Design a protein with these regions (language model features):
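PLP-dependent class I/II
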Residues: 1-130
C-alpha cells in the first residue's frame, strides 16, 4: 500500500515547476513573439546564406536549430570529420549528426543562438571552403 501511495505522490512534474509553467503560458505573449521573431530571422539569414553558396538547406518550421545535410562532395567524410573541417578551416562550430545516432551521420546541426552578425560571419567562413 505504501508503494502505491508513493507512486502517486512522486508521479509527475514538481508542483512549483507546474505553477511557473502555468503563469508563463497564461502571461503576456509579447516576449514570446519577440523571441520567435528573433530565431526566425536568424534561421532565415543562415539558410539563405548557405543556399547562396550552394549548400542546399531547408529552413525548419519551428526550432532554434538547423539540421543541414552534408553536401555531396563532403559526405564521404562523415559528420565528425566534416565538423572538424568546418572548425579548422571555416572557424565554424557545428554539432556532428553522428552524435544523435547513426542515421545522423550525413547531417550537421547548427545552433541559432548567435546574433545575425556572427551567423553571417560563419557563412562567409563556410563559403571559403566551398
Amino acid at each position: 500500500a505504501l508503494a502505491r501511495i508513493k507512486s502517486y505522490q512522486y508521479y509527475g512534474m514538481f508542483q512549483p515547476i507546474q505553477i511557473a509553467a502555468t503563469v508563463a503560458l497564461n502571461g503576456p505573449r509579447d516576449c514570446v513573439e519577440e523571441i520567435r521573431d528573433t530565431y526566425q530571422h536568424r534561421r532565415n539569414v543562415l539558410c539563405e546564406s548557405l543556399n547562396r553558396i550552394g549548400w542546399k538547406v531547408t529552413p525548419p518550421r519551428a526550432t532554434m536549430m538547423v539540421w543541414a545535410e552534408i553536401p555531396d562532395r563532403f559526405k564521404k567524410m562523415g559528420s565528425l570529420e566534416f565538423c572538424k573541417l568546418l572548425l579548422e578551416q571555416a572557424k565554424v562550430a557545428v554539432a556532428p549528426g553522428i552524435g544523435f545516432g547513426e542515421g545522423g551521420d550525413n547531417f550537421v546541426r547548427f545552433s541559432l543562438v548567435e546574433n545575425e552578425h556572427r551567423i553571417r560571419q560563419a557563412a562567409r567562413g563556410i563559403r571559403e571552403i566551398f
